[in-house]
């Protein structure tokens, strides 16, 4: 397609596939955790908040290593997934999805939590006074009012997933057509003789996609602020 080589197209396609699936699976969990952190008071809340945000402060290689010892074929959990279901994250695009979801998760939670925090608790109290159940309040009040924040979190997570490298290459290596996303392919081309042009093209694609995602996220965040007022 145009001036992209097949390996470049494969990396772009795999990156979009991995990022999309990662966000689809991580978003419901991020919404739930963000709601808990925003609306509930319980012992261990700060601990949960710290665990959620660990991927923001730990080196990605450390996250990749933790995934390796927990979710690989011989990992603490991964071995049972393999023995019972024949399912493995090791050396496959599924592992890239998992590592991308983990790295994007705290950004999604932060954005969605801010949206929940902006909702006036008095609205929820009024809804409960009128007989609405907590579940109905969540789906008819909390979620619609925080929708822009949820989408902004998803967009930020998508951008972070596209840029994920350290955790992915540590967990599932750098295998063409399997785990070689844009950052991994860029790394490979940089180390390959005469790979400068391919690296530059992938770099340009990554910048364009990231700018679009960040612009969309900022626009949605501003919209959420105006709507909250």
Positions of predicted regions on the chain:
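Hydrophobic positions within alpha-helical transmembrane segments of bacterial inner-membrane proteins
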Residues: 19, 23-31, 35, 61, ...
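C-terminal transmembrane helix and the adjacent membrane-cytosol boundary/short C-terminal tail
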Residues: 44, 113-124, 128-129, 199-229
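Alpha-helical transmembrane segments of multi-pass membrane proteins
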Residues: 13-21, 55, 59, 135, ...
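Interhelical loop and adjacent transmembrane-helix boundary motif
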Residues: 1-10, 169-211, 216
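Transmembrane alpha-helices
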Residues: 24, 109-112, 116, 120, ...
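Membrane-interfacial helix termini and adjacent extracytoplasmic/periplasmic loops
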Residues: 3, 64-101, 171-175
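Transmembrane-helix boundary motif in ABC transporter permease subunits
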Residues: 21-52, 65-67, 115-117, 122, ...
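Non-cytoplasmic
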Residues: 72-74, 150-188
């Amino acid at each position: 397609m145009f001036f992209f080589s097949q390996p470049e197209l494969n990396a772009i396609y795999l990156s979009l596939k991995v990022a999309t699936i990662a966000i689809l699976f991580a978003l419901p969990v991020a919404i739930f955790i963000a709601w808990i952190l925003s609306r509930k008071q319980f012992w261990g809340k700060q601990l949960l908040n710290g665990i959620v945000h660990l991927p923001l402060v730990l080196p990605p290689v450390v996250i990749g290593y933790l995934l390796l010892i927990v979710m690989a074929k011989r990992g603490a959990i991964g071995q049972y997934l393999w023995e019972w279901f024949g399912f493995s994250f090791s050396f496959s695009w599924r592992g890239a999805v998992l590592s991308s979801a983990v790295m994007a998760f705290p950004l999604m939670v932060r954005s969605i939590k801010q949206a929940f925090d902006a909702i006036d608790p008095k609205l929820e109290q009024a809804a409960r006074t009128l007989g609405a159940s907590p579940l109905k309040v969540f789906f008819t009040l909390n979620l619609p009012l925080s929708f822009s924040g949820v989408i902004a979190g998803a967009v930020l997570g998508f951008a972070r997933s596209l840029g994920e490298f350290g955790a992915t290459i540590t967990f599932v290596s750098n295998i063409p057509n399997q785990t070689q996303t844009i950052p991994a392919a860029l790394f490979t081309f940089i180390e390959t003789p005469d790979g400068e042009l391919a690296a530059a093209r992938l770099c340009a694609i990554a910048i364009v996609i990231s700018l679009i995602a960040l612009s969309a996220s900022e626009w949605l965040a501003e919209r959420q602020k105006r709507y909250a007022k």
